């Protein structure tokens, strides 16, 4: 599970910004509901099940989610889905000459299979310039490896920890690691069993979602195996969907627009011929006799479709103890539905975490949804760099109206809206 995530010099983030999922011992509310104890042989504080990030438009809320998505993809694919010479997908803070030409840095602390790990790397568009991994079995620090690029020598220097096994194979892993790839990714691809556990945390635990662009493909692909859970999920959101069926539809050349250029039309038909597409059909009960009435996709509201699209990934996250990063959780969803989603996660009965951004301040106004150490604010500095601040940095009273305080500007993270007069 996620302990801490830090980002330096990435997009709107200039100085190091850290999101911590460690629960504060100071707050006594919702301990059983919103925090959990890590199964580990070391004594470690409880972790939070969720964290919310508030901030105005263009403040950098999405940047943190994008940073984790980049790290996750880079760990999982840098060794096998890129070629020598491909650019690394980092984007530095561009409003300063110093950072514009500097490296981006990412640090992740997490638990996997009862062991704490600290993994991180620095990179620019051309190469990884540093990489490190430490393990803490029973709380004792063990270096697995460190990797640094020596610019003067144009070569990499590796230091192996005494507990990092592999013998001569470590040299093979090192020599096979391209400048634009991670050693962690490469070594696992070459069957390094000792690094499989931390690699699997990124591969199997981390998930990032943007509900505004989430399609129904994942939910439909896994629909039959999770049908009852999906219907229960939609019912919990107070949607009166009695049944859903997924039909397979073969591609029909007649659907290709007639005004499409002949050459392009021929290519489309050639590429799509014989392919099948999934289509969801929704059924509601008749108010007269309970008969199931079919509704086509275009007859279903955008909110219902958004929840259906979201249900598959959401159930996957909750059932598999994953760590979910969601950008704009409230997109197309009613505030009360958002509240219910958070409660479902908190009551999952197993370790599961979510970090999400939102503009929905009603979450702050409802007691029993979030603890004060689960709330974060992000805003731009005078240098237009994103600054992430926990609500716990402010002197917040037990009985303080958080929504009112936030909207009143007490904690930052709100837009400064100027008066605007439109001329005739």
Residue ranges and their predicted role:
Residues 60-102, 175-234, 343-348, 352-353, ...:
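An exposure/low-complexity boundary signal
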Residues 8, 212-299, 420-424:
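Extended helical coiled-coil dimerization/tether regions that scaffold
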Residues 1-42, 46-75, 287-417:
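Switch/communication elements of ASCE P-loop NTPase nucleotide-binding domains
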Residues 172, 270, 365-367:
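Short proline/glycine-enriched turn/loop segments at secondary-structure junctions
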Residues 13-15, 113-117, 127, 139-141, ...:
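Short acidic/polar mixed-charge low-complexity motifs
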């Amino acid at each position: 599970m996620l302990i801490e995530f830090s980002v330096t010099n990435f997009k709107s983030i200039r100085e190091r910004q850290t999101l911590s999922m460690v629960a504060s011992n100071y707050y006594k509310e919702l301990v059983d509901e919103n925090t959990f104890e890590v199964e580990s042989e070391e004594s470690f504080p409880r972790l939070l099940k969720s964290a919310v990030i508030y901030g105005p438009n263009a403040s950098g809320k999405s940047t943190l989610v994008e940073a984790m998505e980049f790290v996750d993809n880079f760990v999982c694919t840098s060794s096998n889905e890129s070629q020598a010479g491909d650019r690394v997908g980092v984007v530095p803070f561009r409003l300063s000459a110093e950072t514009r030409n500097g490296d981006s840095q990412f640090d992740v602390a997490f638990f996997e299979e009862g062991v704490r790990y600290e993994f991180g790397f620095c990179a620019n568009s051309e190469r990884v310039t540093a990489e490190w991994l430490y393990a803490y079995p029973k709380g004792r620090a063990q270096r697995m490896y460190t990797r640094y690029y020596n610019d003067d020598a144009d070569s990499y220097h590796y230091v192996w920890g005494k507990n990092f096994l592999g013998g001569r194979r470590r040299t093979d892993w090192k020599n096979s690691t391209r400048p634009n790839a991670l050693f962690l990714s490469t070594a696992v691809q070459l069957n390094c069993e000792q690094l499989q556990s931390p690699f699997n945390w990124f591969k199997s635990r981390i998930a990032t979602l943007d509900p505004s662009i989430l399609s129904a493909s994942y939910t439909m692909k896994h629909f039959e195996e999770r049908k009852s859970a999906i219907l229960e999920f939609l019912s919990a959101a107070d949607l009166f969907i009695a049944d859903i069926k997924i039909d397979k539809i073969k591609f029909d050349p007649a659907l290709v627009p007639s005004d499409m250029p002949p050459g392009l039309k021929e290519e489309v038909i050639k590429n799509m011929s014989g392919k099948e597409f999934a289509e969801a059909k929704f059924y509601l009960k008749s108010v007269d006799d309970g008969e199931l009435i079919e509704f086509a996709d275009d007859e279903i509201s955008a909110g219902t479709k958004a929840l259906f699209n979201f249900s598959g990934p959401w159930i996957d996250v909750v059932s598999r103890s994953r760590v979910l990063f969601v950008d704009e959780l409230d997109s197309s969803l009613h505030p009360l539905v958002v509240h219910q989603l958070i409660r479902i996660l908190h009551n999952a009965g197993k370790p599961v975490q979510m970090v999400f951004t939102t503009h929905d301040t009603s979450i702050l106004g409802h007691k029993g949804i979030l603890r004060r150490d689960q709330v974060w604010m992000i805003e731009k500095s005078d240098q237009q760099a994103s600054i992430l601040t926990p609500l716990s940095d402010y002197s917040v009273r037990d009985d303080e109206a958080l929504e009112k305080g936030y909207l009143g500007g007490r904690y930052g993270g709100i837009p400064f809206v100027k008066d605007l007069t439109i001329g005739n």
